[in-house]
Amino acid sequence: MKHIRNFSIIAHIDHGKSTLSDRLIQVCGGLSDREMAAQVLDSMDLERERGITIKSQSVTLNYTAKDGETYQLNFIDTPGHVDFAYEVSRSLAACEGALLVVDAGQGVEAQTLANCYTAIEMDLEVVPILNKIDLPAADPERVAEEIEEIVGIDAMEATRCSAKTGIGVDDVLENIVSAIPAPEGDPDAPLQALIIDSWFDNYLGVVSLVRIKNGSLKKNDKIKVMSTGQTWGVDRLGIFTPKQVDTDVLRTGEVGWVVCGIKDILGAPVGDTLTLAKNGSEKPLPGFKKVKPQVYAGLFPVSSDDYENFRDALGKLSLNDASLFYEPENSAALGFGFRCGFLGMLHMEIIQERLEREYDLDLITTAPTVVYEVEQTNGETMYVDSPAKLPAVNDIEEIREPISRCNILVPADYLGNVITLCVEKRGVQVDMVYHGNQVAITYDIPMAEVVLDFFDRLKSTSRGYASLDYNFQRFEASNMVRVDVLLNGDKVDALALITHKDQSQTRGRQLVEKMKEFIPRQMFDIAIQAAIGNHIIARSTVKQLRKNVIAKCYGGDVSRKKKLLKKQKEGKKRMKQIGNVELPQEAFLAILHVGKD
Protein backbone atom coordinates (compact mmCIF):
# COMPACT_ATOMS: atom_id res chain seq x y z
CA MET A 1 0.00 0.00 0.00
CA LYS A 2 2.78 2.47 0.73
CA HIS A 3 3.68 2.32 -2.96
CA ILE A 4 0.30 3.56 -4.18
CA ARG A 5 -0.25 7.22 -5.08
CA ASN A 6 -3.74 8.47 -5.99
CA PHE A 7 -4.00 11.95 -7.45
CA SER A 8 -6.08 14.15 -9.75
CA ILE A 9 -4.92 16.74 -12.21
CA ILE A 10 -6.80 20.02 -11.80
CA ALA A 11 -6.44 23.30 -13.69
CA HIS A 12 -8.25 26.07 -15.52
CA ILE A 13 -9.50 25.37 -19.08
CA ASP A 14 -6.63 24.94 -21.57
CA HIS A 15 -3.79 24.97 -19.09
CA GLY A 16 -2.61 21.60 -20.34
CA LYS A 17 -4.14 18.93 -18.07
CA SER A 18 -4.83 16.39 -20.79
CA THR A 19 -1.45 16.92 -22.47
CA LEU A 20 0.34 16.39 -19.17
CA SER A 21 -1.66 13.17 -18.71
CA ASP A 22 -0.43 12.04 -22.15
CA ARG A 23 3.18 12.60 -21.13
CA LEU A 24 2.78 10.74 -17.85
CA ILE A 25 1.29 7.77 -19.71
CA GLN A 26 4.09 7.85 -22.26
CA VAL A 27 6.93 8.11 -19.73
CA CYS A 28 5.50 5.26 -17.65
CA GLY A 29 4.93 3.13 -20.74
CA GLY A 30 1.15 2.79 -20.41
CA LEU A 31 0.76 2.70 -24.19
CA SER A 32 3.14 1.89 -27.02
CA ASP A 33 4.17 4.82 -29.23
CA ARG A 34 1.90 3.51 -31.99
CA GLU A 35 -1.21 3.68 -29.80
CA MET A 36 -0.34 7.09 -28.43
CA ALA A 37 -2.54 9.90 -29.71
CA ALA A 38 -2.81 13.51 -28.60
CA GLN A 39 -5.19 13.81 -25.63
CA VAL A 40 -5.52 10.06 -25.47
CA LEU A 41 -7.86 10.33 -22.47
CA ASP A 42 -10.44 12.53 -24.20
CA SER A 43 -12.17 9.54 -25.73
CA MET A 44 -15.52 11.05 -26.75
CA ASP A 45 -15.75 12.47 -30.29
CA LEU A 46 -17.34 15.54 -28.82
CA GLU A 47 -14.36 16.09 -26.52
CA ARG A 48 -11.93 15.83 -29.40
CA GLU A 49 -13.90 18.21 -31.61
CA ARG A 50 -14.28 20.93 -29.01
CA GLY A 51 -10.84 20.28 -27.54
CA ILE A 52 -12.20 20.12 -24.00
CA THR A 53 -12.44 17.42 -21.37
CA ILE A 54 -16.00 16.57 -20.31
CA LYS A 55 -15.67 13.29 -18.42
CA SER A 56 -13.01 12.51 -15.85
CA GLN A 57 -10.89 9.53 -16.92
CA SER A 58 -8.76 7.37 -14.68
CA VAL A 59 -5.47 5.61 -15.46
CA THR A 60 -3.23 3.26 -13.50
CA LEU A 61 0.50 3.40 -14.28
CA ASN A 62 3.59 1.77 -12.84
CA TYR A 63 6.53 4.08 -12.28
CA THR A 64 10.02 3.08 -11.20
CA ALA A 65 11.34 5.98 -9.15
CA LYS A 66 14.97 7.05 -8.77
CA ASP A 67 15.14 5.27 -5.40
CA GLY A 68 14.65 1.97 -7.23
CA GLU A 69 11.14 1.32 -5.87
CA THR A 70 8.18 0.74 -8.21
CA TYR A 71 5.13 2.86 -7.43
CA GLN A 72 1.57 2.41 -8.64
CA LEU A 73 0.17 5.76 -9.77
CA ASN A 74 -3.61 6.04 -10.10
CA PHE A 75 -4.49 9.36 -11.61
CA ILE A 76 -7.64 11.01 -12.82
CA ASP A 77 -7.71 13.64 -15.58
CA THR A 78 -10.51 16.14 -14.82
CA PRO A 79 -12.45 18.76 -16.83
CA GLY A 80 -11.72 22.48 -16.43
CA HIS A 81 -15.07 24.16 -17.17
CA VAL A 82 -17.29 25.61 -14.44
CA ASP A 83 -20.18 23.48 -15.67
CA PHE A 84 -18.31 20.28 -14.90
CA ALA A 85 -17.08 21.24 -11.43
CA TYR A 86 -19.11 18.32 -10.07
CA GLU A 87 -16.99 15.85 -12.06
CA VAL A 88 -13.91 17.40 -10.47
CA SER A 89 -15.18 17.19 -6.89
CA ARG A 90 -16.09 13.51 -7.38
CA SER A 91 -12.66 12.72 -8.78
CA LEU A 92 -10.99 14.49 -5.87
CA ALA A 93 -12.90 12.34 -3.38
CA ALA A 94 -10.97 9.31 -4.65
CA CYS A 95 -7.54 10.89 -4.20
CA GLU A 96 -4.99 11.89 -1.57
CA GLY A 97 -3.42 14.63 -3.62
CA ALA A 98 -3.87 16.91 -6.61
CA LEU A 99 -1.55 18.40 -9.20
CA LEU A 100 -2.48 22.04 -9.68
CA VAL A 101 -1.36 22.79 -13.23
CA VAL A 102 -0.88 26.48 -14.03
CA ASP A 103 0.00 27.88 -17.45
CA ALA A 104 3.28 29.79 -17.02
CA GLY A 105 2.13 32.31 -19.64
CA GLN A 106 -1.47 32.92 -18.54
CA GLY A 107 -1.00 32.70 -14.79
CA VAL A 108 -3.69 31.98 -12.23
CA GLU A 109 -7.30 32.03 -13.48
CA ALA A 110 -10.69 31.69 -11.79
CA GLN A 111 -11.09 27.93 -12.19
CA THR A 112 -7.55 27.37 -10.88
CA LEU A 113 -8.73 29.02 -7.68
CA ALA A 114 -12.11 27.29 -7.45
CA ASN A 115 -10.71 23.80 -8.06
CA CYS A 116 -7.78 24.38 -5.72
CA TYR A 117 -10.09 25.43 -2.88
CA THR A 118 -12.24 22.34 -3.48
CA ALA A 119 -9.10 20.21 -3.12
CA ILE A 120 -7.97 22.01 0.04
CA GLU A 121 -11.45 21.61 1.59
CA MET A 122 -11.16 17.85 1.05
CA ASP A 123 -7.77 17.86 2.86
CA LEU A 124 -5.78 16.92 -0.21
CA GLU A 125 -2.10 17.67 -0.71
CA VAL A 126 -1.91 20.28 -3.51
CA VAL A 127 1.26 20.16 -5.64
CA PRO A 128 1.69 23.23 -7.89
CA ILE A 129 3.17 22.66 -11.36
CA LEU A 130 4.10 25.37 -13.86
CA ASN A 131 3.34 24.10 -17.35
CA LYS A 132 4.13 25.46 -20.85
CA ILE A 133 7.58 26.82 -19.93
CA ASP A 134 8.64 26.31 -23.57
CA LEU A 135 6.44 29.24 -24.65
CA PRO A 136 8.18 32.53 -25.41
CA ALA A 137 5.57 34.30 -23.24
CA ALA A 138 6.22 32.10 -20.21
CA ASP A 139 7.24 33.89 -17.02
CA PRO A 140 7.49 31.21 -14.31
CA GLU A 141 8.83 33.61 -11.64
CA ARG A 142 5.85 35.97 -11.93
CA VAL A 143 3.34 33.11 -12.04
CA ALA A 144 4.89 31.44 -8.98
CA GLU A 145 4.44 34.73 -7.10
CA GLU A 146 0.86 34.94 -8.37
CA ILE A 147 0.10 31.45 -7.07
CA GLU A 148 1.45 32.37 -3.64
CA GLU A 149 -0.40 35.67 -3.60
CA ILE A 150 -3.80 34.65 -4.98
CA VAL A 151 -4.08 30.96 -4.08
CA GLY A 152 -1.92 31.07 -0.97
CA ILE A 153 0.14 27.88 -1.37
CA ASP A 154 3.93 27.74 -1.41
CA ALA A 155 5.01 27.78 -5.07
CA MET A 156 8.61 28.96 -5.22
CA GLU A 157 9.77 25.33 -5.37
CA ALA A 158 7.05 24.42 -7.91
CA THR A 159 8.14 21.95 -10.58
CA ARG A 160 8.53 23.52 -14.01
CA CYS A 161 7.73 21.47 -17.05
CA SER A 162 6.48 21.56 -20.59
CA ALA A 163 3.96 18.82 -21.22
CA LYS A 164 4.14 19.37 -24.97
CA THR A 165 7.91 18.92 -25.35
CA GLY A 166 8.33 16.61 -22.35
CA ILE A 167 10.83 18.81 -20.44
CA GLY A 168 10.63 18.31 -16.69
CA VAL A 169 8.05 15.50 -16.74
CA ASP A 170 10.43 13.22 -14.79
CA ASP A 171 10.64 15.86 -12.07
CA VAL A 172 6.84 15.92 -11.93
CA LEU A 173 6.75 12.15 -11.36
CA GLU A 174 9.44 12.32 -8.65
CA ASN A 175 7.48 15.14 -7.04
CA ILE A 176 4.29 13.05 -7.03
CA VAL A 177 6.05 10.18 -5.28
CA SER A 178 7.64 12.41 -2.64
CA ALA A 179 4.90 15.00 -2.01
CA ILE A 180 1.64 13.03 -2.19
CA PRO A 181 0.86 10.77 0.80
CA ALA A 182 0.08 7.06 0.40
CA PRO A 183 -3.57 6.02 0.87
CA GLU A 184 -4.84 5.12 4.32
CA GLY A 185 -7.14 2.17 4.93
CA ASP A 186 -7.22 -1.26 6.49
CA PRO A 187 -6.68 -4.19 4.08
CA ASP A 188 -8.21 -6.62 6.62
CA ALA A 189 -11.34 -4.60 7.40
CA PRO A 190 -14.69 -5.36 5.67
CA LEU A 191 -14.81 -4.11 2.08
CA GLN A 192 -15.83 -0.50 1.47
CA ALA A 193 -15.61 0.72 -2.12
CA LEU A 194 -16.78 4.14 -3.29
CA ILE A 195 -18.41 4.39 -6.73
CA ILE A 196 -16.82 7.42 -8.39
CA ASP A 197 -18.40 7.09 -11.81
CA SER A 198 -20.57 4.69 -13.82
CA TRP A 199 -21.42 4.22 -17.46
CA PHE A 200 -23.58 1.87 -19.48
CA ASP A 201 -22.08 -0.70 -21.80
CA ASN A 202 -24.50 -2.41 -24.17
CA TYR A 203 -22.88 -5.82 -23.59
CA LEU A 204 -21.70 -5.70 -19.98
CA GLY A 205 -24.45 -3.59 -18.40
CA VAL A 206 -23.38 -1.04 -15.81
CA VAL A 207 -19.61 -0.57 -15.47
CA SER A 208 -18.54 1.26 -12.29
CA LEU A 209 -15.30 3.00 -11.48
CA VAL A 210 -14.52 2.38 -7.80
CA ARG A 211 -11.94 3.41 -5.24
CA ILE A 212 -11.30 0.73 -2.60
CA LYS A 213 -11.18 2.48 0.79
CA ASN A 214 -10.94 -0.61 3.04
CA GLY A 215 -10.65 -4.36 2.43
CA SER A 216 -10.19 -5.89 -1.01
CA LEU A 217 -12.42 -6.96 -3.90
CA LYS A 218 -11.87 -10.21 -5.80
CA LYS A 219 -13.39 -11.78 -8.89
CA ASN A 220 -16.55 -13.84 -8.17
CA ASP A 221 -17.12 -12.10 -4.81
CA LYS A 222 -20.76 -11.51 -3.88
CA ILE A 223 -21.18 -7.80 -3.28
CA LYS A 224 -23.99 -5.62 -1.97
CA VAL A 225 -24.90 -2.11 -3.13
CA MET A 226 -25.58 -0.28 0.11
CA SER A 227 -28.26 2.18 -0.98
CA THR A 228 -30.46 -0.39 -2.74
CA GLY A 229 -29.48 -3.45 -0.67
CA GLN A 230 -29.28 -5.61 -3.82
CA THR A 231 -26.55 -8.25 -4.13
CA TRP A 232 -24.57 -9.07 -7.27
CA GLY A 233 -21.70 -11.34 -8.27
CA VAL A 234 -18.53 -9.68 -9.55
CA ASP A 235 -18.08 -10.89 -13.15
CA ARG A 236 -14.98 -8.93 -14.08
CA LEU A 237 -12.79 -6.28 -12.55
CA GLY A 238 -9.62 -4.51 -13.53
CA ILE A 239 -7.78 -1.27 -14.13
CA PHE A 240 -7.36 1.25 -16.94
CA THR A 241 -3.88 1.52 -18.38
CA PRO A 242 -5.70 3.59 -20.19
CA LYS A 243 -7.07 0.48 -21.94
CA GLN A 244 -9.42 -1.73 -19.92
CA VAL A 245 -7.27 -4.53 -18.49
CA ASP A 246 -8.69 -7.42 -16.45
CA THR A 247 -7.13 -8.30 -13.10
CA ASP A 248 -8.16 -10.74 -10.36
CA VAL A 249 -8.22 -8.46 -7.35
CA LEU A 250 -8.43 -4.78 -6.38
CA ARG A 251 -6.67 -4.01 -3.10
CA THR A 252 -7.04 -1.23 -0.55
CA GLY A 253 -6.22 2.18 -1.98
CA GLU A 254 -6.54 1.13 -5.62
CA VAL A 255 -8.83 2.60 -8.25
CA GLY A 256 -10.36 0.24 -10.81
CA TRP A 257 -13.48 -0.82 -12.69
CA VAL A 258 -16.04 -3.45 -11.75
CA VAL A 259 -18.69 -5.25 -13.82
CA CYS A 260 -21.44 -7.06 -11.91
CA GLY A 261 -23.96 -7.62 -14.67
CA ILE A 262 -26.26 -4.90 -13.35
CA LYS A 263 -28.74 -4.11 -16.12
CA ASP A 264 -30.85 -1.65 -14.15
CA ILE A 265 -29.65 1.89 -14.70
CA LEU A 266 -30.40 2.90 -11.11
CA GLY A 267 -28.66 -0.22 -9.77
CA ALA A 268 -25.35 1.40 -8.83
CA PRO A 269 -25.72 5.13 -8.29
CA VAL A 270 -22.63 7.33 -8.21
CA GLY A 271 -21.46 8.14 -4.67
CA ASP A 272 -22.75 4.82 -3.35
CA THR A 273 -20.76 2.25 -1.37
CA LEU A 274 -20.15 -1.37 -2.35
CA THR A 275 -19.46 -3.96 0.35
CA LEU A 276 -19.38 -7.76 0.59
CA ALA A 277 -22.74 -9.53 0.90
CA LYS A 278 -21.41 -11.65 3.81
CA ASN A 279 -19.67 -9.97 6.77
CA GLY A 280 -19.84 -6.66 4.97
CA SER A 281 -19.31 -3.21 6.38
CA GLU A 282 -22.20 -1.82 8.45
CA LYS A 283 -22.05 1.83 7.47
CA PRO A 284 -21.60 3.36 4.03
CA LEU A 285 -18.87 5.85 3.13
CA PRO A 286 -19.84 9.51 3.06
CA GLY A 287 -20.88 10.02 -0.57
CA PHE A 288 -20.98 13.25 -2.52
CA LYS A 289 -23.27 16.14 -1.86
CA LYS A 290 -25.99 16.17 -4.48
CA VAL A 291 -25.66 19.07 -6.88
CA LYS A 292 -28.72 21.12 -7.72
CA PRO A 293 -29.24 21.89 -11.39
CA GLN A 294 -29.05 25.62 -12.13
CA VAL A 295 -30.67 25.71 -15.57
CA TYR A 296 -33.80 23.93 -16.71
CA ALA A 297 -35.05 23.42 -20.25
CA GLY A 298 -37.69 21.27 -21.91
CA LEU A 299 -36.38 18.66 -24.35
CA PHE A 300 -38.89 17.17 -26.78
CA PRO A 301 -38.40 14.58 -29.52
CA VAL A 302 -39.32 15.98 -32.96
CA SER A 303 -41.41 12.91 -33.75
CA SER A 304 -43.45 11.51 -30.89
CA ASP A 305 -42.51 7.92 -31.87
CA ASP A 306 -39.04 8.56 -30.45
CA TYR A 307 -40.36 9.17 -26.93
CA GLU A 308 -39.49 5.69 -25.61
CA ASN A 309 -35.97 5.76 -27.08
CA PHE A 310 -35.52 9.25 -25.71
CA ARG A 311 -36.48 8.08 -22.22
CA ASP A 312 -34.01 5.17 -22.34
CA ALA A 313 -31.27 7.43 -23.69
CA LEU A 314 -31.78 9.92 -20.87
CA GLY A 315 -31.61 7.10 -18.35
CA LYS A 316 -28.32 5.81 -19.72
CA LEU A 317 -26.87 9.28 -19.94
CA SER A 318 -27.88 10.21 -16.40
CA LEU A 319 -26.05 7.12 -15.16
CA ASN A 320 -22.90 8.48 -16.76
CA ASP A 321 -23.54 12.09 -15.80
CA ALA A 322 -24.75 12.22 -12.22
CA SER A 323 -25.58 15.91 -12.36
CA LEU A 324 -28.30 15.53 -15.00
CA PHE A 325 -31.87 15.74 -13.69
CA TYR A 326 -35.02 14.94 -15.67
CA GLU A 327 -38.77 14.52 -15.22
CA PRO A 328 -41.57 13.94 -17.76
CA GLU A 329 -43.39 16.99 -19.08
CA ASN A 330 -46.01 17.54 -21.72
CA SER A 331 -46.73 20.63 -23.72
CA ALA A 332 -49.72 21.49 -25.88
CA ALA A 333 -47.43 22.70 -28.65
CA LEU A 334 -44.71 20.05 -28.55
CA GLY A 335 -46.30 16.89 -27.17
CA PHE A 336 -44.54 14.65 -24.65
CA GLY A 337 -40.97 15.23 -23.53
CA PHE A 338 -38.83 15.84 -20.47
CA ARG A 339 -37.95 18.79 -18.31
CA CYS A 340 -34.20 18.50 -17.78
CA GLY A 341 -31.93 20.21 -15.29
CA PHE A 342 -28.34 21.15 -16.14
CA LEU A 343 -25.41 22.79 -14.36
CA GLY A 344 -24.98 25.47 -17.01
CA MET A 345 -25.39 26.30 -20.68
CA LEU A 346 -22.30 24.40 -21.84
CA HIS A 347 -23.55 21.34 -19.98
CA MET A 348 -26.93 21.71 -21.69
CA GLU A 349 -25.34 21.96 -25.16
CA ILE A 350 -23.13 18.95 -24.52
CA ILE A 351 -26.01 16.79 -23.25
CA GLN A 352 -28.18 17.72 -26.21
CA GLU A 353 -25.36 16.94 -28.63
CA ARG A 354 -24.59 13.63 -26.91
CA LEU A 355 -28.27 12.62 -27.12
CA GLU A 356 -28.43 13.50 -30.80
CA ARG A 357 -25.17 11.73 -31.65
CA GLU A 358 -24.86 8.72 -29.41
CA TYR A 359 -28.57 7.86 -29.44
CA ASP A 360 -29.53 9.22 -32.85
CA LEU A 361 -32.44 11.42 -31.74
CA ASP A 362 -33.84 14.67 -33.14
CA LEU A 363 -34.72 17.07 -30.35
CA ILE A 364 -36.38 20.44 -29.87
CA THR A 365 -35.20 22.50 -26.89
CA THR A 366 -37.27 25.19 -25.21
CA ALA A 367 -35.74 28.33 -23.73
CA PRO A 368 -33.64 27.65 -20.63
CA THR A 369 -34.91 29.04 -17.31
CA VAL A 370 -33.57 29.04 -13.78
CA VAL A 371 -35.47 28.00 -10.64
CA TYR A 372 -37.57 30.70 -8.98
CA GLU A 373 -38.88 30.63 -5.43
CA VAL A 374 -42.51 31.77 -5.40
CA GLU A 375 -44.40 32.72 -2.25
CA GLN A 376 -48.13 32.39 -2.79
CA THR A 377 -50.83 34.49 -1.13
CA ASN A 378 -51.91 31.46 0.95
CA GLY A 379 -48.44 31.41 2.55
CA GLU A 380 -47.10 28.37 0.69
CA THR A 381 -43.69 28.45 -1.00
CA MET A 382 -43.12 26.65 -4.29
CA TYR A 383 -40.18 26.27 -6.64
CA VAL A 384 -40.85 26.96 -10.29
CA ASP A 385 -38.52 25.64 -12.99
CA SER A 386 -40.69 26.33 -16.01
CA PRO A 387 -42.75 29.39 -16.98
CA ALA A 388 -45.83 27.18 -17.48
CA LYS A 389 -45.85 26.25 -13.77
CA LEU A 390 -45.94 29.85 -12.56
CA PRO A 391 -49.25 30.46 -10.70
CA ALA A 392 -51.72 33.20 -11.73
CA VAL A 393 -50.62 36.77 -10.95
CA ASN A 394 -53.27 37.20 -8.23
CA ASP A 395 -51.98 34.17 -6.30
CA ILE A 396 -48.39 35.39 -6.10
CA GLU A 397 -47.22 37.27 -3.02
CA GLU A 398 -43.64 37.63 -4.30
CA ILE A 399 -41.18 35.96 -6.66
CA ARG A 400 -37.59 35.46 -5.55
CA GLU A 401 -34.91 34.87 -8.14
CA PRO A 402 -31.64 32.98 -7.57
CA ILE A 403 -28.57 35.18 -7.17
CA SER A 404 -25.15 33.78 -8.00
CA ARG A 405 -21.84 34.88 -6.52
CA CYS A 406 -19.44 35.46 -9.42
CA ASN A 407 -15.69 35.59 -8.93
CA ILE A 408 -14.02 37.18 -11.92
CA LEU A 409 -10.27 37.49 -12.49
CA VAL A 410 -9.39 40.09 -15.11
CA PRO A 411 -6.30 42.09 -16.17
CA ALA A 412 -6.54 45.70 -14.92
CA ASP A 413 -6.74 47.10 -18.50
CA TYR A 414 -10.13 45.50 -19.08
CA LEU A 415 -11.62 46.24 -15.66
CA GLY A 416 -13.87 49.07 -16.91
CA ASN A 417 -15.51 46.96 -19.62
CA VAL A 418 -16.14 44.09 -17.23
CA ILE A 419 -17.71 46.32 -14.57
CA THR A 420 -19.98 47.91 -17.19
CA LEU A 421 -21.10 44.44 -18.27
CA CYS A 422 -21.79 43.34 -14.68
CA VAL A 423 -23.89 46.45 -14.02
CA GLU A 424 -25.84 45.92 -17.23
CA LYS A 425 -26.61 42.39 -15.99
CA ARG A 426 -28.10 43.86 -12.74
CA GLY A 427 -25.01 42.91 -10.73
CA VAL A 428 -24.06 44.27 -7.29
CA GLN A 429 -20.38 44.61 -6.47
CA VAL A 430 -19.26 42.76 -3.33
CA ASP A 431 -15.50 42.99 -3.39
CA MET A 432 -12.51 44.08 -5.46
CA VAL A 433 -8.85 43.19 -4.82
CA TYR A 434 -5.76 44.02 -6.87
CA HIS A 435 -3.04 41.34 -7.20
CA GLY A 436 -0.27 42.94 -9.25
CA ASN A 437 -1.70 43.34 -12.74
CA GLN A 438 -4.69 41.05 -12.09
CA VAL A 439 -7.87 42.24 -10.41
CA ALA A 440 -10.17 39.85 -8.56
CA ILE A 441 -13.72 41.21 -8.51
CA THR A 442 -16.71 39.62 -6.87
CA TYR A 443 -20.26 40.40 -7.97
CA ASP A 444 -23.70 39.13 -7.04
CA ILE A 445 -25.51 38.69 -10.35
CA PRO A 446 -28.95 37.11 -10.95
CA MET A 447 -28.52 33.53 -12.12
CA ALA A 448 -30.82 34.08 -15.10
CA GLU A 449 -28.43 36.70 -16.46
CA VAL A 450 -25.31 34.61 -15.87
CA VAL A 451 -26.76 31.53 -17.46
CA LEU A 452 -27.88 33.04 -20.74
CA ASP A 453 -24.85 34.65 -22.33
CA PHE A 454 -22.80 36.27 -19.58
CA PHE A 455 -19.78 34.07 -20.15
CA ASP A 456 -19.61 34.79 -23.91
CA ARG A 457 -20.04 38.51 -23.35
CA LEU A 458 -17.41 38.51 -20.59
CA LYS A 459 -14.90 36.83 -22.88
CA SER A 460 -15.56 39.25 -25.72
CA THR A 461 -15.37 42.46 -23.65
CA SER A 462 -12.08 41.35 -22.10
CA ARG A 463 -10.58 39.94 -25.34
CA GLY A 464 -10.63 36.49 -23.76
CA TYR A 465 -8.52 37.38 -20.73
CA ALA A 466 -11.20 37.40 -18.03
CA SER A 467 -12.11 34.15 -16.33
CA LEU A 468 -15.23 33.34 -14.36
CA ASP A 469 -16.28 31.04 -11.55
CA TYR A 470 -19.82 31.19 -10.18
CA ASN A 471 -21.97 29.42 -7.64
CA PHE A 472 -25.49 29.77 -6.28
CA GLN A 473 -25.69 32.14 -3.29
CA ARG A 474 -29.30 32.81 -2.25
CA PHE A 475 -32.85 33.69 -3.38
CA GLU A 476 -33.75 37.36 -3.43
CA ALA A 477 -37.13 39.05 -3.95
CA SER A 478 -37.36 40.62 -7.38
CA ASN A 479 -39.94 42.06 -9.73
CA MET A 480 -40.27 39.18 -12.18
CA VAL A 481 -43.08 38.70 -14.71
CA ARG A 482 -44.07 36.01 -17.15
CA VAL A 483 -44.22 37.06 -20.77
CA ASP A 484 -46.61 34.87 -22.78
CA VAL A 485 -46.57 34.59 -26.54
CA LEU A 486 -49.90 34.50 -28.37
CA LEU A 487 -50.40 33.40 -31.95
CA ASN A 488 -53.73 34.63 -33.26
CA GLY A 489 -54.89 34.94 -29.68
CA ASP A 490 -53.86 31.42 -28.58
CA LYS A 491 -51.12 31.03 -25.99
CA VAL A 492 -48.13 28.89 -27.00
CA ASP A 493 -46.95 27.41 -23.71
CA ALA A 494 -43.50 26.43 -24.94
CA LEU A 495 -42.60 30.00 -25.85
CA ALA A 496 -43.34 31.71 -22.52
CA LEU A 497 -40.44 33.22 -20.61
CA ILE A 498 -39.89 34.69 -17.14
CA THR A 499 -38.01 37.99 -17.12
CA HIS A 500 -37.48 41.12 -15.03
CA LYS A 501 -40.24 43.75 -15.27
CA ASP A 502 -37.78 46.45 -16.44
CA GLN A 503 -36.65 44.34 -19.38
CA SER A 504 -40.00 42.77 -20.22
CA GLN A 505 -40.95 45.42 -22.77
CA THR A 506 -37.72 45.12 -24.75
CA ARG A 507 -37.53 41.34 -24.44
CA GLY A 508 -41.16 41.05 -25.60
CA ARG A 509 -40.60 43.32 -28.56
CA GLN A 510 -37.40 41.56 -29.62
CA LEU A 511 -39.08 38.20 -29.32
CA VAL A 512 -42.08 38.98 -31.54
CA GLU A 513 -39.82 40.63 -34.15
CA LYS A 514 -37.56 37.60 -34.14
CA MET A 515 -40.52 35.20 -34.42
CA LYS A 516 -41.87 37.12 -37.37
CA GLU A 517 -38.78 36.14 -39.39
CA PHE A 518 -39.31 32.45 -38.76
CA ILE A 519 -43.04 31.89 -39.23
CA PRO A 520 -43.90 31.27 -42.88
CA ARG A 521 -46.67 33.39 -44.43
CA GLN A 522 -50.12 31.82 -44.66
CA MET A 523 -53.37 32.60 -46.44
CA PHE A 524 -54.42 34.82 -43.51
CA ASP A 525 -52.77 37.32 -41.18
CA ILE A 526 -50.95 35.87 -38.17
CA ALA A 527 -50.77 38.15 -35.15
CA ILE A 528 -47.81 37.44 -32.87
CA GLN A 529 -48.30 39.13 -29.51
CA ALA A 530 -46.32 39.27 -26.29
CA ALA A 531 -48.45 39.70 -23.18
CA ILE A 532 -48.05 40.02 -19.44
CA GLY A 533 -51.31 38.70 -17.98
CA ASN A 534 -54.01 40.35 -20.11
CA HIS A 535 -51.86 43.31 -21.01
CA ILE A 536 -50.38 43.15 -24.53
CA ILE A 537 -46.89 44.68 -24.60
CA ALA A 538 -45.77 44.04 -28.17
CA ARG A 539 -47.17 42.85 -31.46
CA SER A 540 -46.06 42.10 -34.98
CA THR A 541 -48.00 40.65 -37.87
CA VAL A 542 -47.02 38.12 -40.49
CA LYS A 543 -48.94 39.44 -43.51
CA GLN A 544 -51.23 37.16 -45.48
CA LEU A 545 -50.61 36.03 -49.02
CA ARG A 546 -53.45 37.22 -51.25
CA LYS A 547 -54.52 36.79 -54.81
CA ASN A 548 -55.17 39.88 -56.86
CA VAL A 549 -58.92 39.32 -57.39
CA ILE A 550 -59.56 42.52 -59.31
CA ALA A 551 -57.01 41.80 -62.04
CA LYS A 552 -59.77 40.63 -64.36
CA CYS A 553 -61.74 43.91 -64.18
CA TYR A 554 -60.76 46.22 -67.02
CA GLY A 555 -62.22 49.60 -66.16
CA GLY A 556 -65.82 48.94 -65.20
CA ASP A 557 -67.71 50.11 -62.15
CA VAL A 558 -66.01 50.55 -58.72
CA SER A 559 -68.82 48.66 -56.95
CA ARG A 560 -67.83 45.54 -58.93
CA LYS A 561 -64.28 45.76 -57.49
CA LYS A 562 -65.61 46.41 -54.00
CA LYS A 563 -67.83 43.35 -54.23
CA LEU A 564 -64.89 41.11 -55.21
CA LEU A 565 -62.64 42.50 -52.45
CA LYS A 566 -65.41 42.07 -49.87
CA LYS A 567 -65.93 38.47 -50.96
CA GLN A 568 -62.18 37.78 -50.62
CA LYS A 569 -62.16 39.40 -47.18
CA GLU A 570 -64.99 37.16 -45.98
CA GLY A 571 -63.18 34.08 -47.26
CA LYS A 572 -60.01 35.10 -45.39
CA LYS A 573 -62.06 35.65 -42.24
CA ARG A 574 -63.56 32.16 -42.47
CA MET A 575 -60.10 30.71 -43.11
CA LYS A 576 -58.71 32.44 -40.06
CA GLN A 577 -61.38 30.88 -37.84
CA ILE A 578 -60.45 27.34 -38.79
CA GLY A 579 -56.79 27.75 -39.78
CA ASN A 580 -54.01 26.87 -37.37
CA VAL A 581 -50.36 27.82 -37.45
CA GLU A 582 -47.55 25.27 -37.59
CA LEU A 583 -44.47 26.48 -35.76
CA PRO A 584 -41.09 25.54 -37.22
CA GLN A 585 -38.20 24.47 -34.95
CA GLU A 586 -36.37 27.77 -35.60
CA ALA A 587 -39.17 29.71 -33.94
CA PHE A 588 -38.47 27.96 -30.63
CA LEU A 589 -34.79 28.71 -30.93
CA ALA A 590 -35.61 32.37 -31.56
CA ILE A 591 -36.04 32.86 -27.82
CA LEU A 592 -32.50 31.76 -27.20
CA HIS A 593 -31.19 34.56 -29.36
CA VAL A 594 -33.30 37.36 -27.94
CA GLY A 595 -31.12 40.19 -26.73
CA LYS A 596 -27.94 38.75 -28.22
CA ASP A 597 -27.65 41.01 -31.22
Curated annotation (Swiss-Prot):
Its main location: membrane. The gene is lepA. Residues 2-184 form the tr-type G domain. GO terms for molecular function: GTP binding; GTPase activity; guanosine tetraphosphate binding; ribosome binding; translation elongation factor activity. Its EC number is 3.6.5.n1. PROSITE patterns: G_TR_1 (PS00301), G_TR_2 (PS51722). Disulfide bonds: none annotated. SMART domains: EFG_C. HAMAP family: LepA (MF_00071). GO terms for cellular component: plasma membrane. This is Elongation factor 4. GTP binds at D14, H15, G16, K17, S18, T19, N131, K132, I133, D134. Required for accurate and efficient protein synthesis under certain stress conditions. May act as a fidelity factor of the translation reaction, by catalyzing a one-codon backward translocation of tRNAs on improperly translocated ribosomes. Back-translocation proceeds from a post-translocation (POST) complex to a pre-translocation (PRE) complex, thus giving elongation factor G a second chance to translocate the tRNAs correctly. Binds to ribosomes in a GTP-dependent manner. It comes from Vibrio campbellii (strain ATCC BAA-1116). One of its GO terms (biological process) is positive regulation of translation. Gene3D superfamilies: 3.30.70.240, Elongation factor 4, C-terminal domain, Elongation Factor G (Translational Gtpase), domain 3, P-loop containing nucleotide triphosphate hydrolases, Translation factors. It comes from the Bacteria. It is a peripheral membrane protein. Keywords: Cell inner membrane, Cell membrane, GTP-binding, Hydrolase, Membrane, Nucleotide-binding, Protein biosynthesis. It is found in: Cell inner membrane. It catalyses: GTP + H2O = GDP + phosphate + H(+). Belongs to the TRAFAC class translation factor GTPase superfamily. Classic translation factor GTPase family. LepA subfamily.
